Amino acid sequence: MQYALGVVGPHGAVVGIDRDPLPQPIPGARFLRGDIYATTDAELLGELKAFDVVLSDMAPDTTGVRATDQARSAALFEEALGRAERLLAPTGSFVGKIFQGPDLEKIRKRMAERFSEVKLVKPDSSRAQSIEIFLAGKGFQ
């Protein structure tokens, strides 16, 4: 949230949601503590009409069973993508974390239908053996 605030500047809005409390408040950001599945679109938007960018760093509590973890990650990603599809302004962008697995290509194709540009991104900071990657979409239509 702090990074996003630096990008949007004093005239932008940053809204975050997490199940865990923030260690300390972040001035200029609006934080909702809760589960994304139990949070309404209206609660996320607040006074805003739409978002220009939706970022999702959600990851499931891992079990160590790769197929289970990948399926849970895909479900969280699809929830975030669904929110983006409902809440993004035209030409908006979405970036979400997902574990690589059998659902990845289907989800990438879904994004390609709604965004003019879709990329797979593995951050340099991510361990080489990590299965987490990010899907980024620009130009929401």
Q: Which residues are covered by each model-predicted region?
A:
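Short strand-turn motif at the edge of the Rossmann-like AdoMet-binding core
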Residues: 19-20, 58-59, 95-100, 123-125
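Short glycine-dipeptide loop
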Residues: 10-11, 87-93
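Class I S-adenosyl-L-methionine
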Residues: 100-141
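Conserved SAM-binding loop of SAM-dependent methyltransferases across substrates and taxa
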Residues: 1-10
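Glycine/threonine-rich flexible loop motifs
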Residues: 62-73
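Class I S-adenosylmethionine-dependent transferase superfamily signal
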Residues: 4, 80-84, 111
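A short glycine-rich, Lys/Arg-flanked "PGG" loop and its adjoining helix->strand segment in the class I
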Residues: 72-90
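S-adenosyl-L-methionine
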Residues: 10-13, 17-63
